[in-house]
């Protein structure tokens, strides 16, 4: 006998967050090991040992379940959607571990999200920034199905194998130059209501949404650039 919708929801609300936490902790532990091993390869003046930070994805996991049950047509789609979302949440444990330790490390390393082979235009745009991030929460740009790798740089880095930031910057610059005039004209013609569709937000490690109340031309331009990069490179804009 199959479960009722209510029973299915209750089961998933209990099991899914626990699954995310269990595998997320494994990802965080792997990130700590990698961080410490990488740090040891540099001749640094300060001592520091990375640790797993306090990470709580419970409410985000609850949201994953409830949204999926609302949107999915059948149990097969529920399984598929939650499988993809759980992969994202688990990778966020690694992201948060890198960013938390980089912020506390007296060596003040920079960090970046390295695009994977076949990455979408959004991830290539993020990757084009290279090792420049220094603010809490910037790696919240990960999306569902994203397999990009977070990493840190302690200075004088020999580079990451397969990561060509200059090439990504060329992609970005070419796309931006081709859409800037059009974007500026379109933004000027928009009504206040239309502009409200374009805001800049980020998610903190505890799941809070910050920013996003004020229309942002930069957010609109960013979307135009991503769209143009996708067309020029014949890739997806944003892999959901």
Task: Describe these PLM feature segments.
Residues 1-103:
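N-terminal alpha-helical interaction blocks
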